[in-house]
Amino acid sequence: YTNLTEIRRKVFKEVSALAYEKADKSVDEIAHQMEELPYKIIPGDIATYRESVFLERAIVGERIRMTMGMPMQGVDQPEQISDGLEEASRPEVYYQPPLINIVKFACNACEDNVYRVTNACQGCLAHPCREICPKEAISFVDKKAYIDQEKCIQCGMCFKVCPYQAIHHHVRPCAAACGMDAIGSDEHGRADIDYEKCVSCGQCLVNCPFGAIADKSQIFQVIQAINEGYTVVPIVAPSFVGQFGKGSVGRLREAFKEIRRSEER
């Protein structure tokens, strides 16, 4: 259980509550509540996870939209979180592709495929890292190895021969997790998805430590369908067993039965 899990669950909880309340409220009232959600999920005026509480709320705002199946907005123009709510409120509406999205201003722009010397370097006499480098990119500064990134071609030979494992291969977590080599970098060094290659497996989402990658959901539309009397059949993925903690299987089974009984009344 991580901070990312907590935020994700808070967003889903609030969006679900909003969907159930919609049956008794106008679109304008729900839109007003949507605008208040980032302040409810991220209270106070002191940042908890990032350098600014405003950034935290902006990211949560994008997560709220994606949880409702709506497209991201970005921060380059003035828009409200609730823009497009009326269209998204229809139970038959499908989320707008792509499924997997990168919140650019949440991305840490992690370095990718970079070799760096750590403080584990012993400054040994043999200097195998320097001797094997085909581009003469390694020198010694204060008796410690130093890699010139302008010359380095990321061949990894120094990494392989260091007897102290003092050279670290830094890779971007989301890119390392992607089996389709679909993640590159934009002009600012932030992660960027090539949707021609992406298969929406979600591995990048799971492995991003900054929670900058999120998927779209239709929980809002599903609840609308339930409220309006549509026949909704839940199909539970087997993976749910490991997602809600110990002792949750029986409780969830009873919850599903209760939902069904509520619909039949």
Predicted features by range, described:
Residues K246-R260:
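Conserved, compact domain cores that house catalytic/ligand-binding motifs in diverse enzymes
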Residues E264-R265:
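Conserved small/polar residues in nucleotide/adenosyl-binding loops
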Residues V222-V232:
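Glycine-rich phosphate/diphosphate-binding loops that line cofactor/substrate pockets in enzymes
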